[in-house]
Curated annotation (Swiss-Prot):
Entry coiled-coil feature ranges: none
Pathway: Cell wall biogenesis; peptidoglycan biosynthesis
PANTHER family cross-referenced by the UniProt entry: GLUTAMATE RACEMASE (PTHR21198:SF2)
SUPFAM superfamilies from the UniProt entry: Aspartate/glutamate racemase (SSF53681)
Disulfide bonds: none
UniProt-recorded name of the protein: Glutamate racemase 1
Function per UniProt: Provides the (R)-glutamate required for cell wall biosynthesis.
Length: 266
């Protein structure tokens, strides 16, 4: 494995930018290839078999780009595949979210907002219970929040109303921890924190995931030894909304995005 190879980041759309941002904070000299499957987003309502197929196509494409590792920045993908089936070093956001939730909670009452597919898989429920069998896990699918992010936002009042509708019922459950079980959701963090106020710890799994990636690279002498990190953005759909959302979140209005035809993944 070439330590100077790029790190691949996969998401169904623009949400994985939240993971890229955390990685850039602690591994700024690494090269990254971000792949957003924006033509086929959202994944959350698709069957497991279809998600597996799409993921295999993207991973194989990234292998051809000589990536040294793949970061799955999509909880829906993580809940649909077995990472051991892929012959490449792979890190997953969902596992980081499970660990973060268990570490954050004091009363063992944890809320999870995610996509329909992630909720139905019960991956968070089972994972949290595996680490804390006494935990109470309350889940809710919030596909409308994914669409808000992918479409490049609406007016603030509309976003707040959608976030409130999705999250306020958790407060009645006396949760002390809320997991953002979809990488799109940290983009809406100011609105989420406004709804839950100071009563709940909001967990962004990308923080732990980024530290796990760095820890592995350091311990296995895989940290890039050349200076000056570069980022390549690849999408399968239209570029405009991706550039708008990603550019805003990364504070970079001039990101270059290349569109990849689905046929190139076959």
């Amino acid at each position: 494995m070439d330590k100077n190879g790029p790190i691949g980041i996969i998401d169904s759309g623009v949400g994985g930018i939240t993971v890229l941002k955390r990685l850039l904070e602690i591994l700024p000299e690494e090269d990254y290839i971000y792949f957003g499957d924006t033509l086929r987003v959202p994944y959350g309502n698709r069957p497991k078999e279809e998600i597996e197929k799409f993921t295999r196509e993207i991973v194989n494409y990234l292998k051809k780009q000589k990536v040294k590792a793949v970061v799955i920045a999509c909880n829906t993908i993580c809940s649909s595949i077995n990472k051991n089936d892929y012959e490449i070093l792979m890190f997953g956001i969902l596992e980081a979210g499970i660990k973060s939730a268990v570490e954050a909670t004091s009363n063992g009452r944890i809320g999870v907002i995610a996509t329909k597919r992630t909720v139905e898989s019960e991956a968070y429920l089972k994972g949290i219970k595996r680490l804390n069998r006494n935990a109470m896990v309350f889940q809710k699918a919030c596909p409308e929040l994914v669409l808000i992010v992918e479409n490049g936002f609406y007016e603030a009042s509309s976003i707040y109303s959608a976030v409130k509708k999705c999250t306020e019922e958790f407060l009645e459950k006396d949760i002390d921890t809320l997991v953002l079980g979809c990488t799109h959701f940290p983009i809406l963090l100011p609105f989420i924190e406004r709804v839950v106020d100071n009563k709940v710890t909001v967990v962004d799994p990308a923080i732990k995931l980024a530290h796990e990636v760095k820890k592995y690279l350091v311990e296995n002498n895989l940290v890039k030894d050349k200076k000056g990190g570069q980022i390549r953005f690849l999408v399968t759909g239209e570029k405009e909304n991706f550039i708008k959302v990603a550019g805003t979140f990364l504070n970079d209005k001039h990101i270059d995005v290349l569109r990849i035809a689905i046929e190139e993944l076959k």
